[in-house]
Structure formats: structure tokens, C-alpha cells
Amino acid sequence: MRLLTTFGALLLMVACSPEPQPIAYGTDFCDFCRMTIVDKQHAAELVTTKGRVYKFDAIECQVQYLQQHQEVEFSHFLVTDYASTEGGLFAAEDCTYLISPNLSSPMGANLTGFADQKIAQQFQAEKTGELYDWSSLQAHFAK
């Protein structure tokens, strides 16, 4: 009986663990601006510690949503990589961000995320603009 109780508790913990979900491009709506998410190079996602998933059509929507919901605890901050056309999600804290007037994003902030810092630097050299890490990006949008 004790083994069954332990197994049940373990199963409950695994079933409730907050996990990211794939974005259904062309179907899912942005939880900030309500536009349909179609751009695989600018999308983003948040997952709360309780497992609720929020999806965004642009990183700037995600950042603004975070600023308006500071009381919510998030377990995952995810963004897509501009250099990839696959639409896969990467940990936002590990990415590099470029704000460039020569590289537009869906909501007009000209904000693009890169999983690889060297590729971000290459785009900066070509397109100009300013590079940010996750925390400096939050500070930039808090102004």
C-alpha cells in the first residue's frame, strides 16, 4: 500500500509539472494583443509555475505582458530564434536580443531574439542596432 501511495504522489507531481507547449502557428492567438501567431521567427511563450501557458506573436508582447503581470510566477520564459525558420522555443534567459530599425518585428518594436550570440552580433553588424541580454531587455522596456 505504501508503494502505491508513493507511486500515486510521484505521478501527480509529474502530471502537474509546468511544461511548454508547441505554438500552433496560424491558429493560436497572442495572449497580449490577440493577433494570430504566424511568424515563426518572432513568437514567444510563458509558462507559469502552475502550468498555465501564454503564447505571443512577438517578443515585445511577451515583455509587455510580463510587466503587467509581475505578481505571476513563471517557470519558463521562451522565445523563438530569428535565425531559424522552425519556430522552436529557446530559454529567453540564454538568448541575445537585437533592436534594429532595419529588422522589423510583428508589433513594430524591431525586436528580434537569437539563440546564438555570435549570430546576433553578425546581424547587428549588418543591420545596426543595439544588443541586449534578457535582463537588460526587461530594463529597456520598463522605461
List each model region and its residues:
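Mature extracytoplasmic domains of secretory-pathway proteins
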Residues: 55-93, 97
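Sec-dependent signal peptide recognition
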Residues: 1-9
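Bacterial signal peptide processing site
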Residues: 17-19
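Short metal-coordination and nucleic-acid-contact micro-motifs, chiefly zinc-binding Cys/His arrays
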Residues: 26
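Short aromatic-glycine-(Arg/Gly/Cys) micro-motifs in beta-strand/loop hairpins
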Residues: 41-47, 93-106
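Post-signal-peptide N-terminal segment of Sec-exported extracytoplasmic proteins
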Residues: 31-71
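C-terminal partner/receptor-binding element of secreted or periplasmic proteins
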Residues: 115-143
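C-terminal motif of bacterial Sec signal peptides marking the signal peptidase cleavage site
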Residues: 12-15
